[in-house]
Swiss-Prot record:
Lineage: Bacteria, Pseudomonadati, Spirochaetota, Spirochaetia, Brachyspirales
Record pathway: Amino-acid biosynthesis; L-proline biosynthesis; L-glutamate 5-semialdehyde from L-glutamate: step 2/2
GO BP terms, alphabetized: L-proline biosynthetic process
Localisation: Cytoplasm
Gene coding for it: proA
Protein name (record): Gamma-glutamyl phosphate reductase
Organism: Brachyspira hyodysenteriae (strain ATCC 49526 / WA1)
A Pfam short name: Aldedh
Reaction(s) catalysed by this chain's protein: L-glutamate 5-semialdehyde + phosphate + NADP(+) = L-glutamyl 5-phosphate + NADPH + H(+)
Length: 432
């Protein structure tokens, strides 16, 4: 099938998907989760092939270590995948919810109703779990989806997609082409030109992929280009607890977009705290880069130079900087960060309030690891990605982020001319 025909069919499916009731969608998701569990050995075998191919690409410096790590799909990740699908089942159906209701006049009722976005294209790199996450959210929100994964994960993507496609094909109410997978690099360029049919593009990958998509399409793009996340260790912080958060934020999953990349330390505790942090990171094989002020305290030769503050390592590497106060911390974050996730570690309520007010990011925390910015951890069931946009959806984007709304008026043969010429007047009585 030609790509244009697939896209047209998927667009046609969007209209039929809106009529599916919640039970049909939930039963489909439960069946997909069950089939993924039953076929996990096939999925792991496919992932093994991808990892062998990816290892060659890594050896040739064609992909990064962080991309290689994201490609791995083990037992724990698959448990999370299946749990994520089942959690989506538990969530309230976001479609056809009355968001606002106003009585404009007698027998003239305005309602704001949630509805699907339509046809969504998701382009991703080395994230085989994306297929099940995105598909489950699109099914529950009655959107059709076209998925395009990287060649490095092709076998795993096919294995998971085939399970989803077969399951949906066995449910008579589901229209064909509700969930689609395309493969070639040429497909990306063609998809980006199809603004007549595709309503939203979601890129899941590195900076170069996201920037390429944003620069080459007229279709709205939802996502983030970088994950340059910060921790600020305030002078009032509980230092031992702060160390645990620093380690978790960097080492728990270094290649994640919500892993910390820069740690800012208040000058009043720097001489005491930085040596503790150095010893902890050294023990956990985390490379540290620092500015001149930090190097006056940490004099070891293994401390590297910070070449650029706006930089995402995506590995067991981090930048360290001393700041004078909370204001300097949030100014640095707003200048060099990516508006993704930033956290203050502090016992001072005023400093916490300042930080959480003035840091211009989608996720802002106090006394918590940056790794919490995730749809599953937020209770969204799964996520299509993290958005740093300031329109439509921001932060981890779950079901609600895949809906928009329409205004419906229920009238009784009213005409505007009566209101313009004062033969009738509006009540504008808010009901909901």
């Amino acid at each position: 099938m030609q790509l244009i025909d697939l896209v047209k069919n998927a667009k046609e499916a969007t209209y039929k998907l809106q009529s599916l009731n919640t039970d049909i969608k939930n039963n489909a998701l439960l069946e997909i989760a069950k089939k993924i569990e039953e076929n996990k050995d096939k999925i792991f075998e496919a992932n093994k092939k991808d990892l062998e191919y990816a290892q060659k690409l890594l050896d040739e410096n064609k992909i990064s270590k962080s991309m290689f790590n994201r490609l791995k799909l083990d037992e724990n990740k698959l448990i999370d995948v299946v749990s994520g699908i089942r959690d989506v089942v538990k969530l309230e159906d976001p479609i056809n919810k009355v968001l606002l209701e106003t009585e404009l006049d007698d027998n003239l009722l305005l309602k704001k109703i949630s509805c699907p976005i339509g046809l969504i294209a998701v382009i991703f790199e080395a994230r085989p779990d994306v297929i099940s996450q995105i598909s489950s959210l699109c099914i529950k929100s009655s959107n059709a989806v076209i998925l395009k994964g990287g060649s490095e994960g092709e076998n795993t993507n096919k294995a998971i997609y085939n399970i989803i496609e077969e399951t949906l094909n066995n449910i008579k109410e589901f229209p064909k082409n509700s969930v689609n997978l395309v493969f070639t690099r040429e497909d990306i360029k063609e998809l980006l030109s199809m603004d007549k049919y595709i309503d939203l593009i979601i890129p899941r990958g590195g900076n170069s992929l996201v920037q390429y998509i944003k620069s080459n399409t007229n279709i709205p793009v939802l996502g983030h280009a970088d994950g340059i996340c910060h921790l600020y260790i305030d002078e009032s912080a509980d230092q031992e607890k702060a160390l645990k958060i620093c380690l978790d934020s960097k080492a728990q999953y270094p290649s994640a977009c919500n892993a910390v990349e820069t740690i800012l330390v208040n000058k009043n505790i720097a001489s005491e705290y930085l040596p503790k942090l150095y010893n902890l990171f050294k023990e956990n094989e985390i490379k540290m880069n620092a500015d001149a002020e930090v190097k006056k305290i940490l004099t070891s030769s293994d401390i590297g130079e910070v070449k650029e503050w706006h930089f995402e390592y995506g590995d067991k590497e981090v930048s360290l900087k001393i700041v004078s106060d909370t204001e300097e911390a949030y100014n640095h974050i707003n200048k060099y960060g990516s508006h993704h996730t930033d956290s203050i570690i502090s016992e001072n309520k005023d400093n916490i309030e300042k930080f959480m007010t003035f840091v211009d990011s989608a996720n802002v925390y106090c006394n918590a690891s940056t790794r919490f910015s995730d749809g599953f951890r937020y209770g969204f069931g799964a996520e299509v990605g993290i958005s740093t946009n300031k329109t439509h959806a921001r932060g981890p984007v779950g079901l609600e982020g895949l809906t928009i709304y329409k205004y419906k008026i229920f009238g009784n043969y009213q005409i505007v001319d009566d209101y313009v010429n004062h033969r009738a007047s509006f009540k504008h009585k808010r009901i909901k």
